């Protein structure tokens, strides 16, 4: 391990009180490459990938390009704010063909910052249905109102069932 890995571990410890090993850091040449690898690692051909719309277009494009099916959980626009339809989310997560949830936190393109309670609800639902959470937290540094809750640092279960990415 090198200077960069030590700095990343130290930063997560200070910012989120979350500890992990330097050996758990893996590099990818791009977000698209890393996402494609994760989709192939955690799903089967023809399997479903849960995601929330509106969504960053590469999420759907890469899912389809890798022979998987997009399972869309639309965010509802209510009183000027995007809200999660947890009933629909759980129904989709319970589908035996679904094994991966692509979480964008904060959400891109809406800018929605999920609360720790909402993230914990995602974790509970996904853990109950053996769905891995891939948490794209690349925009976590751009939260201007409220506070970013770091998914893997929320609980042991969250750390166990999630993979996260940042740059």
Feature-to-residue mapping (PLM):
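Conserved donor-binding loops in enzymes that form glycosidic bonds
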Residues: 166
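Walker B catalytic acidic pair
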Residues: 137
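Walker B beta-strand of ABC/ABC-like P-loop ATPase nucleotide-binding domains
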Residues: 102, 133-134
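Conserved core of the PLP fold type I
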Residues: 1-124, 141-142, 147-158, 162-163
């Amino acid at each position: 391990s090198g200077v960069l890995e030590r700095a990343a571990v130290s930063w997560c410890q200070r910012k989120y009180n979350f500890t992990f090993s330097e050996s758990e850091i893996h590099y990818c040449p791009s977000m698209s490459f890393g996402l494609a690898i994760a989709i192939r690692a955690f799903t089967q051909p023809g399997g479903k990938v849960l995601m929330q719309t509106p969504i960053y277009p590469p999420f759907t494009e890469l899912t389809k390009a890798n022979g998987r099916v997009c399972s869309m959980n639309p965010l509802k626009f209510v009183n000027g704010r995007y809200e999660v339809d947890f009933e629909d989310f759980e129904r989709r997560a319970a589908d035996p063909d679904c094994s991966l949830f692509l979480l964008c936190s904060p959400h891109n393109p809406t800018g929605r910052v999920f609360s720790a309670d909402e993230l914990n609800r995602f974790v509970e639902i996904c853990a109950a249905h053996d769905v891995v959470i891939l948490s794209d937290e690349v925009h976590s540094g751009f939260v201007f109102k409220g506070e970013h809750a770091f998914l893997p640092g929320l609980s042991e279960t969250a750390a166990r069932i999630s993979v996260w990415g940042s740059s």
